[in-house]
């Protein structure tokens, strides 16, 4: 697992440029236990996420991870880099199923800088892929960052 957590106080609007990349976050392989725990935490006990026989029965080839878990991985990447209090908007599209043992890598790129109500805002694109490069999530985000002066 890569942990590129940066002190959020060190990420300033003035220092971020369009085209900059966010330090990637690589998660350990998704496990069955992790999905059962996530089901308990989220209240989503759909057997598609916890029962291998059910997944085979309905044709998904086994268990698939909760989409919101993978979205949470992307959110972790954003909060690790920018800090937990600056996120203003976060939208994703689910593009593919995540399976047991998939290694998810989250990446992001800055696409725009602008001001809203005297806040320096950064817009960017994010994605989550597995070890084969298959896209699981694409999305966008907006954060409000402090200025140096």
Describe the function of each predicted region.
Residues 52-56, 92, 144:
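Residue-level signal for alpha-helical context at structural boundaries
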Residues 80-102:
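Mid-chain, well-packed structural core segment of small domains
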Residues 2-86:
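Hot-dog-fold acyl-thioester-processing enzymes
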Residues 1-22, 97-149:
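HotDog/MaoC-like acyl-thioester-processing domains
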